[in-house]
Amino acid sequence: SYSMEHFRWGKPVGKKRRPVKVYPNGAEGESAEAFPLEFXXELARERPEPARGPEGPDEGAATQADLDNGLVAEVEATSAEKKDEGPYKMEHFRWGSPAKDKRYGGFMTSEKSQTPLVTLFKNAIIKNAYKKGH
């Protein structure tokens, strides 16, 4: 999707996503954005566990890699939830919806503003009828 700055009441919610390039022959040209997260996760798995006491793994202290992986997974989960929240909400406009006098482009105005036009037509019709008569 493209940015909607040309719209009258503001910008859409969310950022523009860049497509991820997929190469059939492996990881030749992986995008620089997606690579470090996966690479760091693999490094964290390959790294040997630090020596611990006989009581087993210390539950209070999580390694930095574990924290990073947890945060990344959490962010992905919340973004997936937001997509399927329910019915589509109109968030394109800055204040929820345009002001009433700005809606419909102003062509549905009150009847009062049309009365001079009606009078003008009546006068024109009467004049034409008068000219045809004489």
Swiss-Prot record:
Modified how: Specific enzymatic cleavages at paired basic residues yield the different active peptides.
Free-text tissue specificity from the UniProt record: ACTH and MSH are produced by the pituitary gland.
GO MF entry, a single one: G protein-coupled receptor binding
Valine amide found at: 13
Residues where Phosphoserine is found: 31
The UniProt record lists the keyword Cell inner membrane: no
Compositional bias annotation for Basic and acidic residues: 43-52, 79-104
Subcellular location: Secreted
Gene Ontology biological-process annotations: neuropeptide signaling pathway; regulation of corticosterone secretion
Pfam families: ACTH_domain, Op_neuropeptide
N-acetylserine found at: 1
SMART domains in alphabetical order: ACTH_domain, Op_neuropeptide
Stretches for region Disordered: 43-107
InterPro entries: Mcrtin_ACTH_cent, Opioid_neuropept, PMOC, POMC-derived_peptides
Keywords: Acetylation, Amidation, Cleavage on pair of basic residues, Endorphin, Hormone, Phosphoprotein, Secreted
Transmembrane segments: none
One GO location term (cellular component): extracellular space
Keyword NADP belongs to the record: no
Similarity annotation: Belongs to the POMC family.
Name the record gives this protein: Pro-opiomelanocortin
Organism: Loxodonta africana
UniProt gene name: POMC
